[in-house]
């Protein structure tokens, strides 16, 4: 990261499927710290599940304290249509939160067909999707800063 002042980033993490979301959180925290934007414990917010992520993310973004919000969760397909409703609601809600607040809200919600797929995407390696969501958030923060600075020039 090349910004002189590191951006303050919040992380919202679903408490459902913690064996997966804990790995996503570790990936996001490790990446943000490595990029010079460590996240303090008070800036890590628990959400009951993926469906609650959008409201919490939007509320955090509206405080004006955060340059971006990383959202992490895991929805694994079961035997009913619940998977589709939760996945779509979380996806559209997080996109709307970012658009309405003009604050980067990244989508680090796994939507997998099996437990094995979820575990593979939350391992402590370069393919960790929490890491990717944190990277997307930081990259978007930097892009928006450049756009806003150029608009003022």
From Swiss-Prot:
Pathway: Cofactor biosynthesis; riboflavin biosynthesis; riboflavin from 2-hydroxy-3-oxobutyl phosphate and 5-amino-6-(D-ribitylamino)uracil: step 1/2
Gene Ontology MF terms in the entry: 6,7-dimethyl-8-ribityllumazine synthase activity
Keyword Oxidoreductase listed: no
Record: active site: 82 (proton donor)
Listed GO biological process terms: riboflavin biosynthetic process
Entries under InterPro entries matching the protein: LS, LS/RS, LS/RS_sf
Binding site for 5-amino-6-(D-ribitylamino)uracil: 16, 50-52, 74-76, 107
EC number: 2.5.1.78
One Pfam family from the record: DMRL_synthase
One CC-aspect GO term: riboflavin synthase complex
Positions with a binding annotation for (2S)-2-hydroxy-3-oxobutyl phosphate: 79-80, 121
Alphabetic keyword roster: Riboflavin biosynthesis, Transferase
Classification via SUPFAM superfamilies: Lumazine synthase
Function: Catalyzes the formation of 6,7-dimethyl-8-ribityllumazine by condensation of 5-amino-6-(D-ribitylamino)uracil with 3,4-dihydroxy-2-butanone 4-phosphate. This is the penultimate step in the biosynthesis of riboflavin.
Family: Belongs to the DMRL synthase family.
Record protein name field: 6,7-dimethyl-8-ribityllumazine synthase 1
Protein species of origin: Caulobacter vibrioides (strain ATCC 19089 / CIP 103742 / CB 15) (Caulobacter crescentus)
Taxonomic classification: Bacteria, Pseudomonadati, Pseudomonadota, Alphaproteobacteria, Caulobacterales
């Amino acid at each position: 990261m090349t910004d002189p002042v590191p951006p303050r980033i919040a992380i919202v993490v679903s408490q459902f499927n913690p064996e997966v979301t804990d790995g996503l959180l570790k990936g996001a925290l490790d990446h943000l710290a490595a990029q010079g934007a460590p996240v303090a414990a008070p800036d890590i917010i628990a959400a009951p599940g993926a469906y609650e992520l959008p409201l919490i993310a939007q509320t955090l973004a509206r405080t004006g304290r955060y340059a971006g919000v990383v959202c992490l969760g895991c929805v694994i397909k079961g035997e009913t249509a619940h998977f589709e409703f939760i996945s779509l609601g979380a996806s559209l809600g997080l996109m709307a939160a970012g658009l309405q607040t003009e604050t980067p809200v990244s989508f680090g919600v796994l939507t997998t067909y099996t437990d094995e797929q979820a575990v593979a995407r939350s391992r402590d390696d370069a393919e960790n999707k929490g890491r990717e969501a944190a990277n997307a958030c930081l990259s978007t923060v930097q892009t928006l800063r450049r756009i806003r600075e150029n608009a003022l020039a």
